[in-house]
Amino acid sequence: MDRDQKKKELEQTKNEMRRKLEEYKERNRIMASKTTPTATTTSTLNTASTPSPPVAQEDFNSIMNSIDSMVPTQATPSSSSTISTSTHAESQKSNYIRPTLTIQSLVIEHDFPPKEIPMYSKGTQTMTDADTSNTNNTPELEAPNKNKTKYQLLQQQQQQQQQQQSSLNQDMQNLSIGTDSINGDGSSTSVANSANIDDDDKDEIEIPELDENEKKDILESDSFKSFFGRSSRVIERALCLDDSIDILVDYTISDENSKGTSKELKLLATLSDERWTKHRSITDISWSTKHPELVVSSYSANEAGSHDPDGVALVWSVNNYFQKPEYVFTCQSPVMTTFFSKFHSTLIVGGTYSGQIVIWDTRAEAKPVQKTPLSSVGHTHPVYSMAVVGSANANSLVSISTDAKLCSWNLENLSQPIETIELNSSNTNSANKAGGGGSGGGAPNMSIAVTSLVFPENELNHFYIGTEEGVICQAGRHGNRIVMNERYKGHFGPITSVDLHPSKGGADFSQYFLSSSTDWTCKLWSSKKETPLYSFEDYVDYVYDARWSPVHPSIFSTGDGSGTLSLWDLNQDLEAPIFRHKISNRSVNRLAWSHDGKRILVGDSGGSLSLFDSSEFSSPTSEEYSQFEDVMTKMVNKSRTSDSPLLGEGENQE
């Protein structure tokens, strides 16, 4: 009976376990259909290493409780019931049906989609119109898809500004309400009572009343009378004149600085360096022929004293004029002239006050890579002017100095000059021509102190020189002698610059040239006439430089000791410049036009380079060339009949 009872209980337990397992499986299927699977879970009934879901944990506990409540598979012998014989035990063991319970690991399978691999392309980075319409429903700011992020930021900024403005208005309103709520006895009313005040009834700012004496003083003041007179005239014009007439025209504006033209030079920037240009004067300016944005400028010694070298040459980029110099070159003597080599774009040539000629290389350090010896072989006086002549395959450097020497150099070897010619009356076959005037005057062996040198285009032997005596000479090299072909007399002070006309645009104006001097004048010359064609005398100080525009036939610029830049147009006016600009209180030492004529650099004695935009004067018309040709023809004809051939006063008196 006991055994049958145990069998029944075991069968009931097995059925109960099957039923609970079926319920457990059904419950898991329902949960799998309702939730999204995230990971594969394997639960083992006899292993507790992996945590199970909460619902599954409850089922496992119930199963384990059922197993614990089961009858043990093998009865434990008791002290009260002891089997006496082994045969009886073996028969009982053989007849005993041992129940078995197999529990397998419960495996839950989940299906996960494959991981999406991002592909970066224009399609994935650009939203469609449909996406934009779904994500951006705000009508205040509709932006292109490409700039969606930018416009969203702008939208956020607008919203923040609106919130700040609204909060500020609210604070101001609360402040005004709080102020109005204070009574005269110092007690304050509630904000609720003051909120009923209408906005139109807010207190206005009180304007102080003036007494009769104050009103009388204002009405009789000069400033009020001037203001009232101008205002009344404007009102009368508005009431009486036609609408097409400018009623605000000002008849007090002077046109002295822009006479005859509405064009002007525009200041772009000022190039200077605290260390290298302060207390130094600019001695020369030159634009690069290869890199149109580069310019080199030379400087004198530091007047305030410095541990830096006396000679400085700086290379600037006008495209980066807010930056420091591109290159800084130094030498032991002040640099009086400098320029980029015409056929070697990386070489910069400089002439010094000691007479040395130095060459810097932009590929090397700040010190010169070559220099001439300090001896009588080269120059012993300051070198104020030099030029590179020849072609790309055969060229030489020609230098001239106040020591009356003209030297030719090979740029690859400056140890000694190729040729040296003495400029004195005994070595020039026309020294006594035109007698006197500062170039010897018939005195034997008198040296010619040269301050400027210029070669015509494509010329190797013929050149123009300006002297300290105020005479301009057209000379030529013939062997070891200098032939003075012409002498141009008209200045009463040292020549500071000579500049030949560039002769572009199809017309030949190469015979005309400009000169400036310390006699406060700038003169226009023709190489075919020994006296000036015209003398420009609208100056109050030394004229240090005069330069033709490289593209416009009738325009040139001058700089004087008063710190003024003057722009002249011979087609418009011969008596006054069309534009005049005060650079500084320091003298204007050097000028340099860019090769395209769209910019001009002005250097002063304070060490500053002023960059001007001259593009308005860089596009001449064919009519302006014809007009300039007519002007010069009339000037030449009148100078021939002038009563005073020395100064050309016949033209100046017109």
Swiss-Prot record:
GO CC annotations, alphabetized: centrosome; cytoplasmic dynein complex; early phagosome membrane; microtubule; phagolysosome membrane
Main subcellular location of this protein, as a coarse class: cytoplasm
SUPFAM superfamilies attached to this UniProt entry: WD40 repeat-like
Region (Disordered): 1-59, 71-95, 116-144, 175-205
The entry's keywords: Coiled coil, Cytoplasm, Cytoskeleton, Dynein, Microtubule, Motor protein, Repeat, WD repeat
InterPro entries the UniProt entry points to: DYNC1I1/DYNC1I2, Dynein_IC, WD40/YVTN_repeat-like_dom_sf, WD40_repeat_dom_sf, WD40_rpt
WD repeats: from-to residues: 277-326, 330-370, 378-419, 445-485, 490-535, 538-578, 583-622
Transmembrane segments: none
Compartment list: Cytoplasm, Cytoskeleton
Keyword Repeat (UniProt): yes
Record GO biological process: centrosome duplication; centrosome separation; Golgi localization; microtubule cytoskeleton organization; minus-end-directed vesicle transport along microtubule; transport along microtubule
Compositional bias of kind Basic and acidic residues: 1-29
Stretches assigned to coiled coil: 1-35
GO MF annotations, alphabetized: dynactin binding; dynein heavy chain binding; dynein light chain binding; minus-end-directed microtubule motor activity
Annotated Polar residues bias: 122-139, 175-196
Biased composition (Low complexity): 32-50, 76-87
Family affiliation: Belongs to the dynein intermediate chain family.
Subunit structure as annotated in this protein's UniProt entry: Homodimer. The cytoplasmic dynein 1 complex consists of two catalytic heavy chains (HCs) and a number of non-catalytic subunits presented by intermediate chains (ICs), light intermediate chains (LICs) and light chains (LCs).
Function, as annotated: Acts as one of several non-catalytic accessory components of the cytoplasmic dynein 1 complex that are thought to be involved in linking dynein to cargos and to adapter proteins that regulate dynein function. Cytoplasmic dynein 1 acts as a motor for the intracellular retrograde motility of vesicles and organelles along microtubules. The intermediate chain mediates the binding of dynein to dynactin.
Name of this chain's protein: Cytoplasmic dynein 1 intermediate chain
Organism: Dictyostelium discoideum (Social amoeba)
Gene: dicA
